[in-house]
A protein has these predicted regions:
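An N-terminal assembly and electron-transfer interface module characteristic of large anaerobic redox
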Residues: 1-399
């Protein structure tokens, strides 16, 4: 649910979290750093016990209509929490009722508060593209000149300068930044995304969107984040050549999958073992695109050959999980951390091994620990990240 809120936050829409009163701070002040200095229209529905028992959705529709009259949003998006999911709230029906009542484009997405942020943000992005992106003025060209940045939200990049650095890298290399999904851009600019020559998938939240734009407008996609000097140069070259095989080995023709499919799997406790019990130099824990980018950086820039990847997000797009272990069970993650000489992860993971805290390199992830470690978040995009990581690897237990 907070994936929807983050992906749509800056775009002028009315975002409604269908949950109990007081839960707004969970989605905003804890997980959304833009809340403090960026205008927004994120509301909580104030779901109460009697409406839950009686299935009274009319109050929700009435309240949304009243808010629309007061705030004049461009669209309405409604996401669910565990309780509406448990009672079987029909979000598609609410979507139709709200659209008919307000005359605005409306998204009703059955998030459940159980899965991660990836399906919600991914579904919201695809809906945005289907609803607002206009037909292109010309076909994609090679070498690429116009770039869409997809999946750029504080959940994966925070607001410490990663987004600004990323955009600077793109424009300094001679590219035109067509649109940024969805930090520092407007809904009108996102509507021109079909004019791009290449899409960059910066996080798993955007993989569904990249596939949709490929199938609809023929725009190829590249998966990855520029990390380090060599990583940045290789990333820019992949953009110019529209090289979908960069980092992933993809052909660019991977079958389109829907974000809703991830929500259909209710087994959140998964383990797909990928490694044996032998020790390794470095274990990296996080979101799949970040993991693939970090592995390339550690191997090619710092010469570390034995790098393992662990993704705790079992609902990530399956195409992105093929080169890593998937584990959301705490004991399994603890065992993998124990095998590694160094662990690069959100600092909360250090609590799994209280006697081995020196082996952990802190890389806070806003989607995991929220605002708790915001002050420690580094700029991990671009050439300057090399010096930062070298220093961290030499601290503690070293390598």
């Amino acid at each position: 649910m907070f994936g929807i809120a983050s992906s749509l936050f800056e775009l002028g829409g009315l975002i409604v979290m269908h949950d109990a009163s007081g839960c707004n701070s969970t989605y905003d002040t804890h997980d959304e750093p833009r809340w403090y200095d960026t205008p927004s229209m994120v509301y909580i529905s104030g779901l109460n016990e009697i409406d839950t028992i009686q299935g009274n959705d009319q109050r929700l529709v009435d309240d949304i209509a009243e808010a629309v009259e007061a705030a004049h949003p461009r669209f309405v998006a409604i996401g669910g929490s565990p309780m509406p999911n448990a009672i079987g709230t029909d979000f598609k029906a609410i979507e139709r009722l709200v659209a008919a009542r307000t005359g605005l484009p409306t998204l009703g997405f059955r998030t459940d508060g159980i899965h991660s942020y990836l399906p919600g943000a991914g579904g919201a992005y695809v809906w945005l593209a289907k609803t607002f992106v206009k037909a292109p003025e010309k076909a994609p060209q090679r070498p690429a000149k116009r770039v869409n940045l997809l999946g750029l939200t504080p959940l994966d990049f925070s607001v410490v300068g990663n987004a600004t650095t990323l955009k600077q890298i793109v424009t300094d290399a001679g590219f035109t930044l067509q649109s940024s999904w969805s930090m520092g851009d407007t809904l009108d600019q996102l509507a021109t995304a079909a004019n791009a020559d290449v899409n960059v998938v910066l996080s798993s939240t955007a993989f569904y969107l990249a596939q949709y734009l490929r199938d609809t407008y023929g725009i190829p996609y590249v998966v990855g984040i520029p990390m380090g000097e060599k990583g940045t140069a290789d990333w820019l070259e992949a953009l110019r050549n529209c090289d979908s095989s960069y980092l992933t080995g993809f052909t660019g023709q991977e079958k389109y999958i829907r974000a809703q499919y991830a929500l259909a799997d209710l087994n959140a406790w998964k383990t797909e073992q990928a490694y044996d019990d032998t020790p390794c130099d470095v274990l990296v824990i996080g979101e799949p695109v970040y993991l693939l980018s970090m592995k390339a950086f550690l191997q090619q820039e710092l010469g570390l050959s034995d790098v393992r990847l662990l993704c705790p997000l079992a609902d990530a797009p399956r195409w992105l999980l093929e080169q890593m272990e998937v584990a959301s069970v705490e004991d399994v993650i603890r065992q993998e951390c124990h095998k590694a000489r160094r662990v690069i992860a959100d600092p909360i993971y250090a609590r799994l091994l209280p006697d081995e805290k020196d082996k952990f390199i802190s890389m806070p992830h806003e989607a995991y620990s929220g605002r708790h470690y915001h002050a420690d978040m580094p700029i991990f995009v671009g050439p300057s990240f090399t010096a930062w990581m070298k220093e961290k690897l030499m601290e503690g237990e070293g390598l």
